[in-house]
């Protein structure tokens, strides 16, 4: 019998009294939600008033659970979920799994421990199990399809619950816990897939890209090419060149050591860590010294803070860790070298950057079966930052133009072009509302890279992009869901209907996590 099943009442109740209550029977196997109706007869040997108290307590369980669920749902609803965020994507995936919810009441109690079989792996890396005749979803992190796990519910909504992972009762065929290298895995929110072999991680990330375009682009399947295999990272551990552990300080300050580390999965609290296996070896070597220095000043902090740790190459080929946001970092891959402020954005997996940028350049120049004379001659790098793609993809073009709204970023892009002997690149500071106004290259001979932040492109930028209408667009994104949304918008507009999607491929810049970098190529069909 499932642990949540309500205890049968056999003690003194008034004659003909009827009690309605939920009885969830063996959800894992039968997945049936039954409304049980029982008749109880008075038992002289037990005080009636005591049984009445038990009756009220039992009959209020479902009502109390639902009140709490509604209260929490309303509280969460007040905070709008950002479109394309992990939370937003998870809700959409749950909606697709539960097409027609029919449950009138939440079938569980908050903080209840349950057993559940995981059926799906979400794009956010969390497992999803369906219970109550597939009408209610339970989201459990650090799980895989086929796992039967024990989980503790900490958030209840009308159609789903969020749970803490407690233990594996029966593992999936895909689970291999001997692969786990981090002592904090299954508590820290940084990684999701350490128990999954790397080839299966890549396969899952391909599925994420497929689902994103299926559900987010709103494009007919005939307009979408088959998704290419995800390109793996040469390093699956010790690849991350930047980490940002943080700490909180309670009101009134702290008298003891600070808890410094990363956010615990499903909680708004920081967990103490002493190492991070996905960070570079240099960062892990320096980590204890940096933390010790912060701890020595613990009583001086009046509020929490984030600690920057960025791996930087030195001129003699060695590495150091930079913690000052304003200091200059040196990044090197292949024959290329870049400098930028430690607090600025730059891709955090050095080991895959050569493959990554080479593929982008191929996409910019690839004729895709079209006539050779249609190959682009000019390259515009929007969101150019410190010039990563402008410099790495410059060969083969008559000229390269990097556009950026930050004057500081443009200055570093110019320095990086000079450092790498790129003579055909120029960089301009553009205004957000007229980003392409200074570009004079003929659109039908121009290829463009766009690499926006996680939230994707705003409406103004997309409209300007359609107005300029370059021959080719290579859209790079760290959030495939906002990428799919933006591409769907572009192709739905009158000026965007002349574009065709040539290729979509994921790159694994963050092994062991659910994140996937997606590169999509659009080409204007010219008769």
From Swiss-Prot:
It holds the Pfam family tRNA_U5-meth_tr. S-adenosyl-L-methionine binds at residues 347, 383, 404, 451. Residues 107-167 form the TRAM domain. [4Fe-4S] cluster binds at residues 182, 188, 191, 276. The active site is at residues 478, 517. It catalyses: uridine(54) in tRNA + S-adenosyl-L-methionine = 5-methyluridine(54) in tRNA + S-adenosyl-L-homocysteine + H(+). Belongs to the class I-like SAM-binding methyltransferase superfamily. RNA M5U methyltransferase family. This is tRNA (uracil(54)-C(5))-methyltransferase. It comes from Schizosaccharomyces pombe (strain 972 / ATCC 24843) (Fission yeast).
